[in-house]
Amino acid sequence: MQLSQIKLSKLILIFLLFFVASAQLSNAQETDILDFLPAILAAAALNTDNDVVVPLNQFNIGDSIGEGEAADGTIGEAHHETVWSTGYNASDTVYSLNERFENSDALSYYENNDARDPDLNHAISGAVMADFAVQATEIVATASSSTPSGTAGMVTILLGNNDVCAPSLDTMTNPVLFEEHYRAGLDVLANSAATSSSSIHVSSIPAIYWLWNAKYTNFKCRLIIWPFVPCENLLDNPSDDCANSVSRLEPDTIYQGDGTNCIRRKTFHARIRDIYNPILRDVLQEYRDDNKLSNAYFIDIFDVQFGDSHVNNGDCFHPSEAGHALLSGEEWCRAQWGLDDLTCAP
């Protein structure tokens, strides 16, 4: 791996300081090299661009998105190499968190690859929040036995999509149960020495509404594929019956003239925004405040909009390779690493 631009800048600065010190030494017989040592050491420790704090390793908890399902358009096929978090395919365009960490510190970071993926990516298609504790328990066991450090440096978590996708609005996972299951998973991480000090990266549920919006004009998606996708409370009767295009593109607002299907989809959207994501955010903050998971962070990606290219053309629902690239970029830039990354838009 090549050194990152940040590390190159630091090395160049150290070299220049050493060069200046050497030049001055040649013109001053009584000057001792030790006089310049503090400056050289300071340069070595200098964080010129706030280097990325790279975890020792990265584990993943999730559902079909965490498996990269249908990322290449093949229905039902997992593509762990393409996943936004732990993906490892250097030839795709995703540039996952795993690849970013590897590029930042190849020597220290225990990167994911094809051989290590079964240990590091525990996402399972169809997983709901009730599976969080199960996947967390697997990670505790694996981190303790299968990593050089014996601990999980970082755990990425994106769950809840299958709790909100349901046959109807009334059959979405009960928010009380959703919170109980969420706490059970967090408790597993908080109560193990392998994960209690890990960087816990909890993502919000994305705005799934935009997956419908991206493909609702596609005949194949609308009439052939979506009847078999288990998210009927969003995808049933998928034609657009919103009052107008302005209404369709503003799912946070119900307009006069919106049809019943449009209102149902906007209600689905609002419940994620107003009920499920606040649970993910507020409960995690509680664990932070109580020092149970002091390095836990909530990453809100609900305002991220998926366009046509971000949704695969096979099942017309899961993120494509471009969709995972979008997620990786947004998750990176909205976390602590993006604060000083010049490639992250303000």
Language model features by range: what are they?
Residues L3, S9-I14, F18, S22-Y95, ...:
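N-terminal secretory targeting modules
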Residues V52, G68-T74, F132-V134, A166-T171, ...:
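Short, solvent-exposed loop/turn and secondary-structure capping segments
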Residues P55-Q58, A90, V94, M129-F132, ...:
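Solvent-exposed, acidic/flexible segments
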Residues N57-E69, P118-A123, G153-L159, D163-C165, ...:
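Structural recognition of the beta-strand scaffold that forms the well-ordered cores
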Residues S64-E67, R100-L107, Q135-S146, G185-A193, ...:
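Structured segments of extracytoplasmic/periplasmic soluble domains
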Residues T74-A184:
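Conserved SGNH/GDSL esterase-like catalytic core that processes O-acyl groups on lipids
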Residues A194-S198:
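A short helix->loop->beta-strand "cap" motif at the edges of active sites that frequently abuts
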Residues W210-P346:
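Catalytic His-Asp segment of secreted/periplasmic serine-dependent ester chemistry enzymes
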